[in-house]
Amino acid sequence: MAVRAQFENSNEVGVFATLTNSYALTAIGASENFYSVFEAELQDVIPICRTTIAGSRIIGRMTAGNRKGLLVPTNTTDQELQHLRNSLPDAIRIQRIEERLSALGNVIVTNDHIALVHPDIERETEEIIADVLGVEVFRQTIADNVLVGSYMSLSNQGGLVHPKTSIQDQDELSSLLQVPLVAGSVNRGSNVVGAGMVVNDWMAVTGLDTTATELSVIESVFRLGEGLGPSNINTGMKDTMVESFY
């Protein structure tokens, strides 16, 4: 299922929300309909937490997480951390990270198996990502951009990358991640696909400006039209899917 939403006139859904297979975070704001889009699809399935991070509403750019964990910057307040711990399932590991590149959502893109990170991220941060999120970590660029989290959107089913990513880069990234990738855009031609949308294994939310063509590409590469609800996602299909996709 791919749906469109706006946060207070902004189409950058990935700036104001974080979505994984086990929880969702949305920014606190006057945009009740933004929250209700998530609520309509997710409320019976995974918890949705409305929060700020370090007093800021751009939570999608400040945090990075997957089914197993959530990483937040070091300037996240104690109250925010406690609120997250109270709202999310006990099994989710929540960890503050002391990292110079503190907009974690811009420098980390991850699914439940593999994370791609900014080439200059600190070694200690890399180890924390591997430990808390339970993933393999690779330093990468996307179309020569170091902000991998801004220019890529990733789930366990597929990925969308910056429209100018070369075929060779797409093939390399795809074999590394073991999921099919497509170069594309969101929000009527925006190349910041990571900031323009959020996705998990059964749902994507993009900006209101996203065209029907962009939406169909998103539904196709993330396999959202195939009735894969949270209960019947089979990650074992991954390898055969990659082979058949090419």
Curated annotation (Swiss-Prot):
Monomer. Associates with the 60S ribosomal subunit. The modification Phosphoserine is found at S174, S175. The lineage of its organism: Eukaryota, Fungi, Dikarya, Ascomycota, Pezizomycotina. It holds the Pfam family eIF-6. InterPro entries: eIF6. It is found in: Cytoplasm; Nucleus, Nucleolus. Coiled coil: none annotated. CDD domains: IF6. This is Eukaryotic translation initiation factor 6. Belongs to the eIF-6 family. Phosphorylation at Ser-174 and Ser-175 promotes nuclear export. GO terms for biological process: cytosolic ribosome assembly; ribosomal large subunit biogenesis; ribosomal subunit export from nucleus. NCBIfam families: eIF-6. GO terms for molecular function: ribosomal large subunit binding; translation initiation factor activity. Keywords: Cytoplasm, Initiation factor, Nucleus, Phosphoprotein, Protein biosynthesis, Ribosome biogenesis. Binds to the 60S ribosomal subunit and prevents its association with the 40S ribosomal subunit to form the 80S initiation complex in the cytoplasm. Is also involved in ribosome biogenesis. Associates with pre-60S subunits in the nucleus and is involved in its nuclear export. Its main location: cytoplasm. The keyword Ribonucleoprotein does not apply. GO terms for cellular component: cytoplasm; nucleolus.
